[in-house]
Each structure stands twice: as structure tokens, then as C-alpha cells.
């Protein structure tokens, strides 16, 4: 299993099970609209940090902040009921 798929599965599990102390559970426990708004704020914040790191030409920081951006985007997708497989299918369509 690839690491992104593993992370996505963990996110889905934490949204479902809401374990105490879980960052994902904390982000996603509110009603859907409030949770999505919180997650969108994080996605925007992380996107800005990727942009700053890229403009600074800081490779390590670009990698670090990109991982945060991808993670929070995955939380948003999972909270929206989108599966890893659905996302993968969309990428496959675009490879043609």
C-alpha cells in the first residue's frame, strides 16, 4: 500500500471513530458545515505557507509545508465523503 493511501485510510478511520486526542477528530467533530469551514481555513493557511516556502526557494520547507497542505486537503476530501479511490479515478482520467 502506498503511504498516501495509508494516510487517507487513517484519516477516514479517525473521522469515523473520533478517538480522544486525535487531531483529525478535533478538526472534523463539529457539524459538517463548521468542520468543513475549519478544514478549509487550514487548507488556505497551508497553501499560503507552501507559496512562501517556494518563493524563498527553501526545498526542505516546501516539502514540509506541502505535506501539511496535502494532509489537510485529504482531511477535507474525506470529511466531504470522497474516497481515495474516487480521487485516484479522477487522476486516471486526467492521464489520458
From Swiss-Prot:
Q: Which InterPro entries match?
A: HisE, PRib-ATP_PPHydrolase-like
Q: Which domain of life is it from?
A: Archaea
Q: What class of enzyme is it?
A: hydrolase
| Enzyme Commission code | 3.6.1.31
User: GO terms for molecular function, please?
Assistant: ATP binding; phosphoribosyl-ATP diphosphatase activity
**Record keywords:** Amino-acid biosynthesis, ATP-binding, Cytoplasm, Histidine biosynthesis, Hydrolase, Nucleotide-binding
According to its UniProt record, where is this protein mainly located? cytoplasm
Subcellular localization: Cytoplasm
Its UniProt entry gives the catalysed reaction(s) as: 1-(5-phospho-beta-D-ribosyl)-ATP + H2O = 1-(5-phospho-beta-D-ribosyl)-5'-AMP + diphosphate + H(+)
Please provide, in alphabetical order, the Gene Ontology terms of the cellular component aspect for this entry. Answer: cytoplasm
Could you tell me which Gene3D superfamilies the record lists for this protein?
A: MazG-like
Name-wise, this protein is Phosphoribosyl-ATP pyrophosphatase
Q: What is the lineage of its organism?
A: Archaea, Methanobacteriati, Methanobacteriota, Methanomada group, Methanococci
Q: Which gene encodes it?
A: hisE
Amino acid at each position: 500500500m502506498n503511504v498516501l493511501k495509508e494516510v487517507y485510510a487513517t484519516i477516514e478511520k479517525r473521522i469515523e471513530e473520533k478517538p480522544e486526542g486525535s487531531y483529525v477528530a478535533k478538526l472534523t467533530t463539529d457539524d459538517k458545515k463548521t468542520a468543513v469551514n475549519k478544514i478549509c481555513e487550514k487548507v488556505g493557511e497551508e497553501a499560503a505557507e507552501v507559496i512562501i516556502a517556494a518563493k524563498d526557494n527553501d526545498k526542505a520547507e516546501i516539502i514540509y509545508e506541502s505535506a501539511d497542505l496535502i494532509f489537510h486537503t485529504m482531511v477535507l476530501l474525506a470529511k466531504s465523503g470522497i474516497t481515495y479511490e474516487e480521487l485516484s479515478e479522477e487522476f486516471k482520467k486526467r492521464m489520458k
